[in-house]
Design a protein with these regions (language model features):
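Extracellular, repeat-based ectodomains that mediate carbohydrate processing or recognition
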Residues: 24-458
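Bacterial N-terminal signal peptides
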Residues: 9-19
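Bacterial N-terminal signal peptides that target proteins for export
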Residues: 1-11
Length: 458
């Protein structure tokens, strides 16, 4: 879980806050800029982390971005030139919300999934002894501008009791494939922390997100009860043209994989398919890094991609493996970042997507190759047009930033692509002094959105 107390409702901008490179003293490291690259800041400085983004499959000028503090949504209808912050996504009955994710269905309905609660658990471990809470989904019928008055409940623990399970890190996905027999289904998976274990849960909606099935355990083997000592973490899913649902997560030692071919009713036994280093690791100048896997699919060919980060080379790199046989076998890992191996420079917090229009695979990540001190990252976008065998790296941000004031940027970012247009969303440490209130320095991160324009591969 990426939430860090204390939480507060910051004053959010209702429209675009443009970035100012003049206030920063570092220049872009020598990578080519992504084609048509634009990067905008959509929040004021505050406690903002863990964003996600989704594109309207009918129109790639329209997209919805989400992030915490709380469960906040912003939307664009002009290919990311301007963004507006939506009202009505914050849960009314709980003190805190977060771990937000977003999907958009074939009709342009947007879905935001998030957890909500009053307090985390004991100081020694946040998931133990927490208060009442649950997992909720809110729907927008107009591309993110307005949201349903009441959220739908996936699972809820309405009263604080000893040893309540903790629902964490939901990830939501919509079946938008016109040839799928389950088109219109919406799926959500998440971690449940219990006193003695972690398990991966799943629920589905067949009525446009209004109601949700009883949660089911889809992890064949449970994990340890803490995320930083071998717990299960990072449910992610992708849908093929025929409606097959593929899902991954980390079990602390590798990528775990499972499949549903009946619209989320049943799943194959989950199994580890790729060996990796543990997903949580220390990174200089950060509180921690997270390398848990992300899955994407080229829907027509069924080629599966899994990306992750680990330190097998002595510093942190980004890797991708692919499967051409629906997950039965997997390729050897391809190193995505193209700086020299073993150079002591970290790349981390990857996210992946595949453009369904042409099968191009994209990975976004923080990259510190250009800083001799291995502190200041830029944001890099990598593209593969050969089925994941190689990646071209592009700079998406003009300048690096210093993360040391905040040190915590969350556990994940967001990426989406359609018809050559790529949207990314990530937090950065604002390069202006943090506000001090009541003698305490406030959190000072901002949410940024990048757009790039690539020609479709032939």
């Amino acid at each position: 879980m990426g939430l860090r107390l204390p939480f507060f409702r910051a004053g959010l901008v209702g429209a675009l806050v443009s970035s100012s490179a003049a206030a920063q003293s570092f220049v872009r490291e020598p990578l080519p800029l992504a084609p048509g690259a634009r990067v905008l800041t959509i929040t004021e400085p505050g406690p903002f982390t863990e964003p996600g983004i989704a594109i309207d499959p009918r129109d790639n000028r329209r997209a919805v971005g989400v992030y915490q503090n709380q469960a906040t949504a912003a939307w664009t209808a002009d290919a990311g030139a301007t963004w507006k912050t939506a009202d009505g996504t914050i849960p009314p009955n709980y003190r805190v919300a977060g771990d937000v994710s977003v999907a958009v269905d074939r009709h342009g309905h947007a879905f935001v999934g998030y957890i909500a609660f009053d307090h985390t658990g004991v100081t020694s471990y946040w998931a133990l002894g927490g208060t009442r809470g649950g997992l909720f989904v809110r729907r927008s019928d107009d591309g993110g501008a307005t949201w349903a008055k009441e959220p739908s409940v996936v699972v809820e623990h309405p009263e604080t009791k000893p040893n309540l399970p903790w629902e964490d890190m939901p990830s939501i996905v919509a079946d938008t494939r016109e040839r799928s027999p389950y088109v219109g289904n919406v799926y959500i998976g998440w971690i449940r922390y219990q006193v003695d274990r972690t398990v991966m849960l799943f629920s589905r909606s067949t009525d446009d997100g209004r109601t949700w099935s009883t949660p089911k355990v889809i992890s064949t083997e449970p994990g340890l009860p803490r995320d930083d000592t071998g717990g299960l973490v990072g449910f992610r899913a992708a849908v093929a043209d025929d409606g097959t649902l593929y899902a991954t997560w980390s079990d602390g030692r590798g990528v775990v994989f499972t499949t549903s071919r009946d619209g989320g009713k049943t799943f194959t036994a989950s199994r580890r398919v790729i060996e990796t280093a543990p997903p949580y690791f220390n990174i200089a100048s950060f509180s921690r890094g997270n390398g848990f896997p992300n899955i994407a699919i080229e829907p027509k060919s069924h080629r599966l991609y899994v990306s992750w980060g680990d330190y097998r080379n002595g510093d942190i790199d980004i890797f991708v493996a692919t499967s051409a046989d629906r997950g039965r076998t997997w390729s050897k890992p391809t190193r995505v970042n193209d700086d020299p191996p073993h150079n002591g420079k970290d790349q981390f917090m990857q996210w992946m997507t595949v453009d369904p229009a042409d099968g191009s695979a994209y990975v976004v990540f923080y990259d510190r190759r250009g800083d001799s001190t291995n502190v200041r990252p830029i944001v890099v976008l990598a593209r593969s047009t050969d089925g994941g065998r190689s990646f071209t790296n592009y700079a998406w941000t003009d300048v690096s930033f210093d993360p040391r004031e905040s040190s915590f940027l969350g556990d994940y970012n967001g990426l989406a692509a359609l018809n050559g247009r790529v949207y990314g969303i990530w937090p950065e440490e604002a390069q202006t002094p943090a506000k001090v209130e009541n003698g305490r320095r406030g959190r000072n991160t901002i949410i940024r959105v990048g757009v790039a324009e690539f020609p479709l591969k032939r």
